[in-house]
């Protein structure tokens, strides 16, 4: 029998214990969690998402860690967000399978103990029960707050790891950016260096099943793989490869002149080796050349995460940069800000299928001079696998002029009136509902149902 301390993300309250046999499945654990929280969880148990609560070094999350304390208050710490954005527990795996695959066993000295958080529980939106009318009102007021930011203030926030295809297209539309695919040319036979694809490590768990470890479990290994294949250039140009997938949201920036904020981080950065000597200097992104977003399986929707990260990094630094989305095997997708045509900024995208060719491109990119000539906005560089010179432009010089915001008429007035009343008398749940209904009716897709 294993005692696991579980915490519901976004719901204030202490962690609660669940006793479960190691041979039972994660699906059984979902049933047990729901049974313990009938007033809090109103969805089917199968709809819960479970993640292990681990620290950056792979240990269990201590209950006095700031991330755990925030959980008690119903807040979502950035470390918790990174965990729930990552690997989920598969319902078909036994608890023993999960613990073994993550090196969280007695044999490894990491068996679950007291004074730790072990499982993070994510409940689908709208499936939280409510112990009081106050909590209902808090949730509704929070939604109106978000409506106020977007409708009256025109604010939008995009979190890189959470950007969906719809949100990604909205971001590109907000900034008038178009993405264009650029053809590449493979090397002729015998040209370039041959590099083996990265081998995603597998482990054999107790029942004999072979399991591929997740990106999170292999970060050090794939960082060393990248370093090994560009080591000579790193040394020559005094650069290094560092992992920034945990900790501070280093790629957080507000788009100049617009109420748009991009937030989050990426997996790897290639930048000045000063960071290797003084890790705290990473916050200034010295000499950064490119970011690398690693996915075990690259999907079309992952483009938008890479694009969001590229836009943020480009706005944060003075020199042109590139983004790479890759599975380190047969998908190496490069993105960069290329030019401005009419009023639209153009981000170019190119795909390479062989690791050897991709690393030739990376090495050629890293030896480029750091700054553009003073007398021109656009630079051109020659890279392997590209037929034509690669154009590069800073996004700040490509963004369209800031236009006047539209008039939302009654919606603005209603939300502003709500805030005026709430500031004097406190939140009013019925008025909040009315404002929410009005905003919903103003959205074409929902107007048919209101």
Swiss-Prot record:
A motif (Nuclear localization signal (NLS)) lies at residues 218-224. InterPro entries: Crinkler_N. It comes from the Eukaryota. A motif (HVLVXXP motif) lies at residues 118-124. Its main location: secreted. Pfam families: Crinkler (PF20147). Induction: Expression is constitutively high and slightly induced during the late infection stages (approximately 1.5-fold). It is found in: Secreted; Host nucleus, Host nucleoplasm. Residues 58-117 are annotated as: DWL domain. Residues 18-55 are annotated as: LQLFLAK domain. Disruption phenotype: Leads to a reduction of virulence on soybean. Glycans are attached at residues 103, 342. Residues 125-450 are annotated as: Effector domain. Residues 1-17 form the signal peptide. The CRN proteins have modular architectures that include a signal peptide, a conserved N-terminus, and highly diverse C-terminal domains. The conserved CRN N-terminus harbors a distinct LXLFLAK motif, which is followed by the conserved DWL domain. A highly conserved HVLVXXP motif marks the end of the CRN N-terminal domains and forms a junction where diverse C-terminal domains are fused. The conserved CRN N-terminus mediates the translocation into the plant host cells. The C-terminal effector region is sufficient for its activity within the host cell. Secreted effector that, with CRN115, is critical to pathogenesis by modulating host defenses. Induces cell death in plant host cells. Suppresses callose deposition and affects expression of defense-related genes including two salicylic acid (SA) signal-induced and antimicrobial PR genes (PR1 and PR2), and genes involved in jasmonic acid (JA)/ethylene (ET)-mediated defense pathway (ERF1, ORA59, PDF1.2). This is Crinkler effector protein 63.
């Amino acid at each position: 029998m294993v005692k696991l301390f579980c915490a519901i993300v976004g719901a204030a309250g202490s962690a609660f214990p669940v006793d479960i046999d190691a041979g039972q499945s994660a699906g059984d654990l979902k049933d047990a969690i729901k049974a313990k929280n009938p007033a809090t969880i109103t969805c089917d148990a199968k709809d819960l998402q479970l993640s292990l609560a681990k620290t950056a070094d792979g240990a269990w999350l201590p209950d006095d860690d700031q991330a755990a304390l925030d959980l008690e208050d119903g807040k979502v710490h950035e470390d918790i967000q990174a965990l729930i954005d990552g690997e989920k527990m598969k319902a078909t795996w036994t608890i023993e399978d999960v613990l073994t695959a993550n090196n969280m066993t007695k044999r490894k000295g990491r068996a679950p103990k007291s004074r730790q958080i072990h499982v993070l529980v994510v409940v689908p939106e709208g499936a939280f029960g409510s112990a009081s009318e106050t909590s209902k009102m808090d949730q509704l007021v929070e939604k109106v707050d978000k409506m106020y930011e977007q409708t009256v203030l025109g604010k939008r926030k995009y979190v890189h790891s959470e950007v969906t295809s719809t949100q990604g297209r909205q971001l590109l539309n907000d900034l008038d950016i178009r993405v264009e695919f650029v053809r590449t040319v493979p090397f002729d036979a015998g040209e370039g260096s041959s590099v083996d694809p990265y081998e995603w490590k597998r482990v054999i768990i107790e029942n004999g099943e072979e399991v591929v470890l997740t990106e999170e479990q292999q970060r050090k290994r794939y960082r060393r793989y990248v370093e090994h294949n560009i080591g000579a250039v790193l040394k020559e140009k005094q650069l290094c490869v560092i992992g920034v997938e945990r900790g501070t949201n280093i790629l957080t920036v507000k788009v100049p002149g617009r109420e748009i904020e991009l937030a989050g981080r990426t997996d790897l950065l290639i930048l000045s080796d000063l960071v290797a000597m003084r890790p705290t200097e990473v916050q200034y992104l010295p000499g950064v050349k490119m970011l690398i977003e690693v996915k075990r399986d690259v999907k079309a929707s992952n483009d938008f995460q890479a694009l969001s990260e590229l836009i943020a990094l480009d706005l944060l630094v003075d020199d042109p940069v590139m983004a790479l989305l890759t599975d380190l095997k047969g998908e190496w997708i490069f993105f960069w800000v290329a030019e401005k045509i009419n009023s639209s900024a153009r981000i170019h995208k190119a795909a390479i299928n062989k690791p050897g060719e991709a690393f030739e491109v990376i090495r050629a990119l890293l030896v480029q001079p750091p700054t553009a000539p003073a007398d021109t906005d656009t630079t051109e560089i020659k890279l392997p696998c590209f037929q034509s010179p690669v154009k590069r432009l800073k996004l700040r010089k490509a963004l369209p002029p800031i236009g006047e915001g539209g008039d939302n008429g009654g919606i603005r007035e209603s939300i502003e009136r709500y805030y005026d009343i709430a500031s004097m008398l406190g939140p009013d749940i019925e008025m909040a509902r009315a404002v929410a209904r009005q905003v919903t009716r103003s959205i074409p897709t929902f107007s048919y149902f209101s």
